[in-house]
A protein has these predicted regions:
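Glycine-rich phosphate-binding active-site loops on the catalytic face of alpha/beta enzymes
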Residues: 88-94, 134-145, 188-208
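Conserved, mostly hydrophobic/aromatic
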Residues: 17, 24, 34, 78, ...
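Catalytic cores of alpha/beta
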Residues: 21, 72-80, 118-129, 177-192
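N-terminal active-site wall of soluble small-molecule enzyme domains
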Residues: 33, 37-102
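Structural motif
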Residues: 26-27, 57, 81, 106, ...
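C-terminal helical cap(s) of enzyme catalytic domains, especially alpha/beta-barrels
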Residues: 103, 186, 201-223
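Hydrophobic faces of well-ordered beta-strands that scaffold small-molecule active sites
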Residues: 5-8, 31-33, 62-66, 86-88, ...
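Glycine/Thr-rich beta-alpha phosphate-binding loop at enzyme active sites
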Residues: 37-45, 49, 116, 126-160, ...
Length: 223
């Protein structure tokens, strides 16, 4: 299993992002942007000019996690800013199929996100349409929350569905990821870790990233 790590830069030092990107770029696979509008969740983060500026600073792909209402009205702005993958919450759109189709028409990958209390069946029904499924293991809005282990049962159900049908979207988890929770998530079927607080509050980013890979190496799936 090729483990992917997408650092969430919400807790990075934004007064010197070029240095932050330089410190993490060699050890990770993509950059995770937690985009919040102050409506779906309370904080407001990462306006379009900021995203466009960050994309120019870093050669990696940017994974835009839209924690916003009415994502269908705004996705084109994030694509234009440089996002390579856009994932949106099932909880805030009445026609996810149309939005997935629009993302594909624009040439970007489509991801779907569910909160910890959203039935996984809603995501399973669209597994064949997406490149990434994101399971929130905390409630969205703020970094540093405690991991919700019950989410892993939803990951297992999703992975069993995909395995039985030859589907292989990325399975991403976001929230409370550290050296204890990362291998548990990987065992459940996760292959893409979003880690923010664990990386950016460490003294050595490269060491933190390497340690995540190390604890997940050789973990056997239990789904």
């Amino acid at each position: 299993m090729n483990l992917r790590i997408h650092p969430s830069i919400l807790n990075a030092k934004h007064d010197d992002m070029q240095a932050e990107f330089d410190r993490i770029a060699a050890g990770v696979d993509s950059i995770h942007l937690d985009i919040m509008d102050g409506r779906f969740v309370k904080p407001v983060t990462f306006d379009i000019p900021t995203i466009a500026r960050y994309v120019k600073m870093c050669p990696l792909e940017f994974d835009a996690h839209l924690m916003i209402v009415e994502p269908e009205k705004h996705v084109d702005e994030y694509i234009q800013a440089g996002a390579s993958l856009v994932n949106f919450h099932l909880e805030v759109t009445s026609n996810p199929e149309a939005l997935i189709d629009h993302l594909h028409e624009r040439g970007v990958k489509a991801g779907l996100t569910i909160n910890p209390n959203t039935p996984v069946e809603e995501l399973i029904g669209l597994a064949h349409r997406i490149e990434l499924a994101l399971f929130m293991s905390v409630y969205p809005g703020y970094g540093g929350q405690q991991f919700i282990p019950e989410v892993l049962d939803k990951v297992r159900a999703f992975k069993r569905h995909c395995a039985g049908r030859g589907l292989d979207p990325l399975v991403q988890i976001d929230g409370g990821i550290n050296l204890e929770t990362a291998p548990r998530a990987v065992a459940a079927g996760v292959n893409t870790l979003v880690a923010g607080t664990f990386i950016f509050r460490s003294e050595d980013y490269a060491e933190a990233i390497a340690s995540l890979r190390e604890v997940c190496e050789g973990v056997e799936p239990d789904y």
